[in-house]
């Protein structure tokens, strides 16, 4: 990502305008039931399973053929509260390396308890997985294909002590 100079005061003014224009004191009920799954691309199914189930302790729930691309594997991990993290592989297609691009994934934040956060940090250390700690509550790491994952020791609906839901 390329950084461009910004007027921080103007950005905060714009955020305030957006809140005033679009946030309602009486927030309506969402039309959505939740996120069914988020799907990423895997270059190696077994390596991805070893990482997400073996290190991050997200149980593998299913391995099926991708209905849209014969020969492709679609597999799922339980990330709690009925949410799934899914992957596809695309054998024979050159999908290129992971890239953070406009419209693409910046990171996927997964809420864990403080106890799990400490435990998973120890497992990352033992496995030699590099990571960055932010604010004492976030661990940012990259999966085997380069996707950025955040393990966040804040409850669902909170972000760094602020209620966001």
Where are these regions (language model features)?
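A short acidic/small-residue loop/turn micro-motif
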Residues: 92, 155-158
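N-terminal beta-strand motif that seeds the catalytic metal site of vicinal oxygen chelate
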Residues: 2-46, 105-108, 112, 161-165
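Vicinal oxygen chelate
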Residues: 6, 44-46, 103-148, 153-156
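Core segments of cupin and vicinal oxygen chelate
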Residues: 41-84
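A short, acidic/glycine-rich surface segment
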Residues: 22-24, 62, 71, 92-97
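Helix-adjacent hinge/juxtasegments
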Residues: 84-90, 94-111
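Residues that flank catalytic or metal-binding motifs in active/ligand-binding sites
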Residues: 34, 73, 81, 104-106, ...
């Amino acid at each position: 990502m390329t950084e461009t100079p910004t007027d921080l005061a103007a950005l905060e003014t714009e955020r305030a305008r957006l809140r005033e224009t679009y946030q309602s004191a009486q927030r309506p009920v969402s039309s959505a039931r939740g996120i069914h799954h988020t799907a990423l691309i895997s270059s190696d199914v077994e390596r991805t399973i070893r990482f997400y189930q073996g290190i991050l302790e997200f149980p593998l729930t299913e391995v099926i053929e991708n209905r849209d691309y014969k020969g492709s594997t679609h597999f799922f991990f339980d990330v709690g509260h009925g949410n799934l993290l899914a992957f596809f592989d695309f054998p024979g297609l050159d999908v290129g390396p992971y890239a953070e691009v406009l419209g693409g994934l910046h990171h996927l934040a997964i809420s864990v308890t403080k106890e799990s956060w400490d435990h998973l940090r120890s497992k990352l250390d033992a496995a030699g997985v590099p990571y960055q700690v932010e604010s004492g509550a976030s661990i940012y790491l990259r999966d085997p294909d380069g996707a950025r994952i955040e393990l966040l020791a804040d409850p669902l609906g909170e972000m760094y002590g602020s209620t966001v839901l």
